């Protein structure tokens, strides 16, 4: 099988939950809540995080900045505000 076909096959097989178009980090919760802690301990990161579980799934989405609705704000210091007619948005 040529390399291009193999790459396409791999991309089709990978679950889409690994990719987050809103910029969040997909994290598997292990039931004790320390999965994200271990992620942040790498490279001595000091970050405040916000996480949002997804129903009964073990997967959730976490932001290293402020979470606003279903996406992450672009940088630290932003606030999540609700704008009537447009929904949630970041105010930086």
Swiss-Prot record:
UniProt KW Secreted keyword: yes
Keywords: Acetylcholine receptor inhibiting toxin, Disulfide bond, Ion channel impairing toxin, Neurotoxin, Postsynaptic neurotoxin, Secreted, Signal, Toxin
Disulfide bridge positions per record: 63-72, 68-80, 73-90, 78-92
Stretch forming the signal peptide: 1-24
UniProt modification remark: The homodimer contains 10 disulfide bonds.
Locations listed in the record: Secreted
Domain notes: The cysteine framework is XX (C-CC-C-CC-C-C-C-C). Displays a mini-granulin fold, a structure composed of two short, stacked beta-hairpins connected by two parallel disulfide bonds. This newly described fold is derived from the same cysteine connectivity as knottins (ICK fold). The name 'mini-granulin fold' comes from the structural homology with the N-terminal region of the human granulin.
Function: Alpha-conotoxins act on postsynaptic membranes, they bind to the nicotinic acetylcholine receptors (nAChR) and thus inhibit them. Through its two C-terminal domains, this homodimeric protein would bind to two nAChR allosteric sites, located outside the nAChR C-loop of the principal binding face and at the adjacent binding interface in a clockwise direction.
Family of the protein in this entry: Belongs to the conotoxin D superfamily.
The protein's name in its UniProt record: Alpha-conotoxin FrXXA
Organism expressing this protein natively: Conus fergusoni (Ferguson's cone)
